[in-house]
A protein has these predicted regions:
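Active-site entrance/lid segments in N-terminal catalytic domains of soluble metabolic enzymes
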Residues: 1-107
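Conserved active-site-proximal phosphate/metal-binding subdomains
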Residues: 95-109, 115-255
C-alpha cells in the first residue's frame, strides 16, 4: 500500500484469525492510520492502537456491542446487517443502523446489502454518516480476487446466497455452491465443529486466489444481485456519489 500512495490507508484485522495479534502489532510498526476490525472484540488491542494514533473502527452487530466499542475508545463503528457477506450477525441493516445511531455519539457507518446510490441514500436516512461496501468492491478492476470469483458475483441473482455455520455460532453468508451445500448437509446431520472446520479449511483461499468457485468459500452479500459490471474504484465511487445525490435530491423532503 505504501508503494501505491503517500495518502493514509486502512487495514482490516479479522480478530478470529490466529495471527490477529501479529497483524495488530504490524499496524503500529508500519504507521497505519486507520484500522477496521471484524469477527470479534478488539478491546485487547485498543489501548496500543490509540496510543499510536490509529483511528479504530470496529464492525458491530448489536447496540450493546456498539456501546461497548464507544466506551473502549472506538472512533466510529460499522453497523453491519445480516445481508452482508462473510461473518454476519442476527439483525438486518434496516433495523440495526438506526438503533445504533440512536445509541452512540460517535459516527455510524452502515454496511450490509448496500451496492448503489439507492442503498447509500437509504443508509443516510437511517442515521449513518457513511457506508461500507464489500461485495460491490470485490469485482472492482483493482481487486486482486480471482476473475472466476468476480464473474460468479456478477452472475449472482437475488436468491443465490445462503448462510452456513449457524450451528457453530459463527454464521457466514456465501454464494451457493458445492461446498456450501455439503456444509449445510453436514450441519443438518449434526456434524461436529471439528468436522465442519476440516471441510472449510483453506476454502476461502481456494475461491479468492485459486478461483475454485465450486469447492471454495464464495463470501458475498445479498447485494450481489445488484452487482452487474466491473469498473475501477474511481469510476465506482463517482457512480455511487452521483446515484446517492440523485436519490436525495429526488426525495419529496429535499429542500
Amino acid at each position: 500500500a505504501k508503494k501505491l500512495t503517500d495518502k493514509p490507508f486502512g487495514v482490516n484485522v479479522m480478530l478470529l484469525n490466529p495471527n490477529a495479534a501479529e497483524v495488530a502489532q504490524i499496524v503500529i510498526e508500519e504507521g497505519v492510520k486507520v484500522v477496521t476490525t471484524g469477527a470479534g472484540n478488539p478491546g485487547k488491542f485498543m489501548d496500543a492502537w490509540k496510543q499510536a494514533g490509529v483511528v479504530v473502527i470496529p464492525v458491530v452487530a448489536s447496540v450493546a456491542m456498539a456501546r461497548m466499542m464507544e466506551r473502549g475508545g472506538a472512533d466510529a463503528v460499522i453497523a453491519e446487517g445480516m445481508e452482508s457477506g462473510g461473518h454476519i450477525g442476527a439483525q438486518t441493516t434496516m433495523t440495526l443502523v438506526p438503533q445504533v445511531a440512536d445509541a452512540v455519539q460517535i459516527p455510524v457507518i452502515a454496511a450490509g446489502g448496500i451496492a448503489d446510490g439507492r442503498g447509500m441514500a437509504a443508509a443516510f436516512m437511517l442515521g449513518a454518516e457513511g457506508v461500507q461496501m464489500g461485495t460491490r468492491f470485490v469485482v472492482a478492476k483493482e481487486s486482486i480476487v480471482h476473475p472466476n470469483y468476480k464473474e460468479r458475483v456478477i452472475k449472482a441473482k437475488d436468491i443465490d446466497s445462503e448462510v452456513t455455520g449457524m450451528s457453530t455460532g459463527h454464521p457466514i453468508r456465501v454464494l451457493r455452491n458445492q461446498m456450501s451445500r455439503e456444509y449445510l448437509k453436514m450441519e443438518k446431520e449434526g456434524a461436529s465443529f471439528e468436522e465442519l472446520e476440516h471441510l472449510t479449511l483453506g476454502s476461502l483461499r481456494k475461491a479468492v486466489i485459486d478461483g475454485d468457485v465450486v469447492n471454495g468459500s464464495l463470501m458475498a452479500g445479498q447485494s450481489a444481485g445488484l452487482v452487474t459490471e466491473k469498473m475501477t474504484c474511481e469510476m465506482l465511487i463517482r457512480k455511487l456519489v452521483k446515484g446517492t445525490e440523485k436519490q436525495i435530491r429526488g426525495s419529496v423532503f429535499y429542500e
